[in-house]
Regions:
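Transmembrane-helix motifs of polytopic, lipid-linked glycan transferases
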Residues: 32, 36-57, 95
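Short acidic/glycine- and proline-prone juxtamembrane loop motifs at membrane-interface regions
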Residues: 75-89, 133
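Interfacial juxtamembrane loops and adjacent helix segments
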Residues: 1-40, 488-492
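Transmembrane-embedded, aromatic-rich helix segments that form part
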Residues: 118-119, 133-151
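Specific aromatic-rich, kink-prone transmembrane helix
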Residues: 48-51, 88-109, 116, 120-124, ...
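Transmembrane helical bundles and short interhelical boundary loops of multi-pass, membrane-embedded
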Residues: 106-108, 116, 149, 153, ...
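Short helix- or helix-capping micro-motifs
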Residues: 63-71, 78, 124, 128
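Lectin-like carbohydrate-binding module/patch detector with strong preference for beta-trefoil
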Residues: 190-443
Length: 650
């Protein structure tokens, strides 16, 4: 929404659909206004790093170094130059940390204390609103809050009521406020975006029907209750596809030698099509029209589903499915005049019913179709049929599933009352407009829940990507991402780290752990190397640098989906903040002699010069200018994984 605000302020007229990454922008897209938002957030990381370091107790020189290191990170520079979310996430994460540190330093329950508490919760809510990984920042802040509560609980000068008040205030400010702010952003989002868009098919039929100009335009005249004789399309709630059949049959034998029923194929087709229409037929009647008055189909009723075009009944039997042999095959029954009889009876179970007498409703009801003879459930298996099945998703009958499998939920999306027994007239009905109007509305909480569920569970079918990397490759700096290349020269933009900076940060993580273990062992033996105030500052620096890095890095070790280098940027931001804290700690508390301190300062100056030289050396790949020769590009390669592009004509 912040990016959309930038586009709005840049007078964007909406005439660009953002369907493909890398698509060339037309003249109507205000590129500068869009890029201004992440660029501003990227720029703010520098003063935020300075303020955070100052709040940790670092000297002005140490805090200045923190901001300078942020400025010289090529990866942050590159990411902030594009319309991407990471700069916003990092900015709000650092703002959350700064506010949490300010809250910790403020006098309890003073006006400024309440202000910083609300600011911390707001910043955390904004971080979560940018990306779900903002939750990791919230957890980091909650760890600090929990340590404060633990410290207060041991303070005997405080009453039990006062400690409880601290707990309640932090729960309200650091948990409830971010949650309310997160929900509020979606409320505003849904208030502003009420029209249909190009990716509506990812959402449920009920969600789509609540949007203007999309499915609502198609379904606005539908009858509400499904009746015997109704003509319907059935959409899977799990996958954006519709129950479908065509005249092709299953092959007599599959590639693995198994035999099939050679019946008419039933699939789940991902596009709207005339072959998606089915007629809900009463099992004891030959009528294919809706009675007057209509007889609604209710929970528990037995129905037959007649394919509208081929006039074959939906069927299943004890034959293994084509791709998922642990399930039964689903077909439209073809009578070959052999001993295998059709079993075209299905029991309707309305899953979201208010009572057992509830009727089957268009768009509103989620239903399961239970095969009566075998007690199996109609569902999308998740597999895709081979060429003989036109690459369409497989539909199977599985054993009764508890809990309910998402692929077994079906929704009537399009619905009309059939009026003709003649096949030609029925086909004409399927192509004619719907005559009635029944509005379908979905409440905010239902929309909010569905959006969260889709964001958590939906995965685009991943293909092998050139720049996919692993978390361990991030630590070795053996991966990069090409963002742009000039069509005529070698000018290009790559997402690359500053090698000297990132290696130094990883070394500092190890050194901090070694120092922490040493201090803890000596304190266990009654030896305190640091005064209480310095020890607390040392722990606080570790909470921020080591804890922030681990909190934003370790979860990716458990992630199975494809990852890219930009996923590491929030963690890299935190480990960069540890460098000046550890250097100042070494200068103040570890190196005692004047000569040693001069040597440390000289080493720091030399190291900082190397970091700056590395930044300048890689700047052409961060900014896209000037164009480099193939030999120059080769000289910049720190790792074999840095896959630079060379123009064929260069």
């Amino acid at each position: 929404m912040l990016l959309a605000l930038g586009a709005y302020l840049g007078d964007f007229n909406g005439n660009f659909t953002w369907e493909r990454i890398g698509a060339e922008y037309n003249a109507a897209v205000p590129v500068r206004a869009l890029r201004a938002v992440p660029a501003l957030c990227g720029a703010l990381t520098v003063p935020l790093a300075y303020l955070i370091s100052s709040q940790l107790g670092l000297s002005p020189l140490g805090a200045f170094l923190a901001g300078l290191l942020m400025l010289m990170d090529n990866a942050l520079l590159t990411q902030s130059r594009f319309v991407l979310l990471e700069p916003l996430l990092i900015c709000f994460s650092l703002l959350s940390v700064l506010c949490a540190l300010k809250l910790r330093a403020a006098r309890s329950f003073s006006v400024s204390w309440w202000g910083w508490l609300l600011a911390t919760g707001t910043a955390c809510g904004l971080a979560i609103g940018v990306k779900y990984t903002g939750v990791l920042t919230l957890l980091l802040v909650c760890v600090l809050a929990a340590s404060d509560i633990w410290r207060l609980a041991g303070d005997r000068t405080l009453t039990h009521l006062c400690v409880c008040a601290h707990v309640v205030a932090r729960v309200a400010g650091l948990l409830l406020l971010p949650l309310l702010l997160y929900v509020a952003t979606f409320w505003l989002h849904l208030q502003l975006l009420q029209n249909a868009g190009p990716h509506d098919h990812l959402m449920s039929s009920a969600f789509q029907a609540s949007l203007k100009g999309g499915l609502a335009r198609i379904t606005q005249g539908q009858p509400l209750e499904v009746a015997f004789g109704s003509q319907v399309t059935l959409r899977s709630a799990h996958t954006p596809c519709w129950l479908h059949s065509h005249f092709d049959v299953y092959p007599i034998t599959y590639a693995d030698g198994r035999g099939s029923s050679h019946q008419q194929q039933v699939t789940c087709y991902p596009y709207k099509d005339i072959n998606n229409w089915w007629i809900i037929k009463h099992p004891h009647s030959q009528s294919l029209v809706v009675d007057s008055p209509p007889v609604p189909v209710r929970h528990g009723d037995i129905v037959q589903l007649l394919h509208g075009i081929s006039t074959k009944l939906l069927n299943s039997h004890n034959v293994a499915a084509a791709i998922t042999p642990t399930c039964q095959e689903v077909s439209c029954y073809v009578d070959y005049n052999i001993s295998m009889q059709g079993q075209p009876w299905w029991r309707v179970e309305v899953l979201n019913r208010a009572s057992d007498s509830d009727s089957w409703k268009t768009i509103v009801s989620d239903v399961q179709l239970i095969h009566v003879n075998t007690s199996t459930v109609l569902r999308v298996s998740g597999a895709v049929l081979p060429e003989w099945g036109h690459g369409q998703p497989e539909v199977v009958a599985d054993l009764t599933l508890r809990p309910v499998h998402p692929g077994s939920r079906w929704t009537v999306e399009e619905h009309r009352h059939g009026r003709s027994q003649e096949q030609a007239e029925r086909e004409q009905e399927l192509r004619s407009p719907i005559p009635k109007h029944v509005p379908h509305d979905l409440g905010f909480l239902a929309k909010f829940y569905e959006l969260q569920w889709k964001m958590l569970t939906f995965r685009v079918e991943e293909q092998e990507h050139r720049y996919i990397s692993t978390p361990l490759q991030w630590l070795r700096m053996s991966s990069s991402i090409a963002y742009w290349m000039d069509p005529h020269t070698n000018a290009q933009i790559h997402l690359l780290p500053n090698p000297w900076l990132w290696v130094s940060a990883c070394v500092c993580l190890l050194l901090y752990c070694a120092c922490l273990v040493r201090y803890l062992l000596r304190r266990q033996r009654g030896i305190s190397d640091l005064p209480a105030e310095c020890w607390e500052r040392f722990l606080l620096a570790g909470w921020l640098g080591l804890g922030g890095w681990a909190m934003h890095f370790v979860p990716y070790l458990l992630t199975e989906r494809g990852l890219f280098l930009y996923h590491y940027l929030p963690a890299a931001t935190f480990h960069t903040l540890l460098i000046p804290a550890l250097l100042e700690h070494a200068h103040t508390h570890v190196v005692r002699s004047p000569a040693g301190r001069y040597a440390l300062l000289a080493g720091c100056v030399a190291w900082l010069a190397a970091v700056y030289a590395s930044h300048v050396q890689l700047a052409p790949l961060s900014k896209g200018t000037p164009a480099l020769s193939a030999q120059q590009l080769s000289s910049l390669r720190w790792s074999e994984g840095w896959d630079f592009l060379v123009h064929p004509t260069q």
